[in-house]
Structures are given as structure tokens and as C-alpha cells.
Amino acid sequence: MQQHSSKTAYVYSDKLLQYRFHDQHPFNQMRLKLTTELLLNANLLSPEQIVQPRIATDDELMLIHKYDYVEAIKHASHGIISEDEAKKYGLNDEENGQFKHMHRHSATIVGGALTLADLIMSGKVLNGCHLGGGLHHAQPGRASGFCIYNDIAITAQYLAKEYNQRVLIIDTDAHHGDGTQWSFYADNHVTTYSIHETGKFLFPGSGHYTERGEDIGYGHTVNVPLEPYTEDASFLECFKLTVEPVVKSFKPDIILSVNGVDIHYRDPLTHLNCTLHSLYEIPYFVKYLADSYTNGKVIMFGGGGYNIWRVVPRAWSHVFLSLIDQPIQSGYLPLEWINKWKHYSSELLPKRWEDRLNDYTYVPRTKEISEKNKKLALHIASWYESTRQ
């Protein structure tokens, strides 16, 4: 077994798998179990690094969410919510249906993040990984985009209030982190950065580069919307061009990163054209930023990712590996993992850590897309630096 670092905590419990709207819903937390077992089977995760999530208290949830919304989620947990109330709080559609004990299961996701926050701030660990979290669409008073409670926003507010931390949220999910953004739009103690597929064609339709915050929060919201069919080179170029100036200027005490892996070309819900190359590279760059600017303090969350067999386990494994300073993996996946899960998978499981790219389609407009993305990224970087002068 490889040498493991005790500096990193990894949140896992089978309880996190209970966050499930229904069996056909695309948000399937089985991806968390698949990732965890892949890491364990590959001798990359030690059981001693795993920490159990607690259940967040109502007061903690209400750091972001409204009292009446939390009460509505409790009612929905027991099937005693009216149709009008369900509609009011976003609980009456295919995206965010009601399920048994949804309050407890959602509060457990939040509690996992707060567990890591306390461990880091007490000096017991340097960084943490919570792949079961990353519910960035939840609004203060409404469910949205498969998200009930916004664990990222709550954790950011918790760190700011309880520990007086300046918090930077870096969100690389294909969907704009709207719930998180609006939670801090007029605040200056938390900066939100989101690079995502443009909202012109993808939920939630927000995240335009002109959304920059308001009042004392102006300049503390940064959005980098990319064109559909953006490929690896352009995504990574725009990310690195825009994110490091934000870190340098804001000078956060801690980073929270949302590692949605739905920028992958195999993801069924988005239109970006990236591969595992980007998904492996992103967390290592965020780790570099944390090491360079926050003394290593970072919590890495999961997020979107709806190809749970061929994409999520390999990509999310590297989120954790970046935290423990292990290199990007190559070669064959553990046979033990493949043999266990091949009977459950709806498609052929990958055999190697690398993408095969046998079904990858190169877009004829790659140069045009990349130039448009870079022009916008340079504009955003220039605007941001001008606000700091």
C-alpha cells in the first residue's frame, strides 16, 4: 500500500446515498460509492482517512436558507406538504421531487461539509474532500437543479461567521453555480468564481459575465461562460487566465471548490466537449492555488456528473488524489472494482484510467470557439484587475 497522508479527510457514509429523488432520476449518489470503492480497491484511499458526516442543525441550515423553506422541506420529508406549498418551494417538478426523509438526508450532506470545515479550522487536517456535496443550485428559499440545501454556500457562511475566514468558491461544474452566487451577491467576505457552459443553452440560464455582484459585493462575483463544444485546451486556458488573478487579489483564507464533472463529452446533460484530461488537471491546479495562497486550506466538493459509470469514478478519484499529492494515474483500473460493478453497469466499464476517445467527435469550429472563449476570458481578467486598482 502506498504511503497516505493524514492531512486529508474524506467524507463518506452510505447515508449519503439516500439523497435520491427516485430510481430514474439522473442525480444518482451511487457515483459516490463507485468512486470510494475505486479509491479503496486501488489502495489510494485509507479507511483511516474516512470521516463520517454529521447532520447539520436548523440554525446552520439557516445561515443561508429561510426558516419557512427549511420547515417546508421537513413537511415534504413526511409527505404532509400541500400542492401549493410544494410549488412555492420548487418541490413539485421532475427535477426536485419529494422523497422520504429528504430533510435529514439533505442536512447530512451539509453536515459532511461542516465536519470538514471544523477539522481544518482546528488544525486536525489540512484539507478535505466531500464528493457527496456540491449542491450549488439550491436557493435560500427554493429547491433547484437537483439541490435541496446549498452545502457550499452554508459552509462558506459558516467559515466566515464562526472563524472569520475570507472564502473563495471556485466552481468548475458545467452548470453555473447560481444558488451560491445569489447567496453572496451583495457580500464582500465571500467571492464566487464560476466557469461554465453559457446559460444561453443550458440550465440555469444565468452566469453571464456581466453578473459581477452589487453594492459592497461588486467585483466579488466572477463568471466565465464558455461556448458549447468547448474542448480541453480552451477550457483550461480560460480557467487559468481568469482564476489566479482572482485568488491573488481577493487573498482568501480558504478555498471551496466545486468539481462537477459534467464538462465531459460523455455527459448526457451538457454540451461541452472536454475529456478526462481537463477533469484530472482542474483539481491539481486548484490544489496549487491553495498551496500558494491559502497555506493549503481547501475543501473539494463533488457537483454535477451524470455518466456515473464511465466518467465520474475516475474523475472524482483525482479530486482526492490531488489533495494527497498523488500523481495522475495511468494504466489499468483494479480488476476487483471492474468485476464487482460490471454486473450493475448499464454500459461497458472502462478498463484504464485514461479516456480511450474512440467515440470522441472533434468539432470543426474548434478554432472559432477557442478564440471567442479566449477573447472573453481576457476581457474578464482585465475587468477584474481594473476593479482591484
Swiss-Prot record:
Pfam families: Hist_deacetyl
Amino-acid biosynthesis among keywords: no
Listed pathway(s): Ketone degradation; acetoin degradation
GO BP of this protein: acetoin catabolic process; epigenetic regulation of gene expression
Record keywords, A-Z: Acetoin catabolism
InterPro entries: AcuC, HDAC_PDAC, His_deacetylse, His_deacetylse_dom, His_deacetylse_dom_sf, Ureohydrolase_dom_sf
Molecular function as annotated in GO: histone deacetylase activity
Family membership: Belongs to the histone deacetylase family.
Role description: Role in growth on acetoin or butanediol. Involved in the breakdown of these compounds used as a carbon source.
Protein name: Acetoin utilization protein AcuC
Organism: Staphylococcus aureus (strain COL)
Gene: acuC
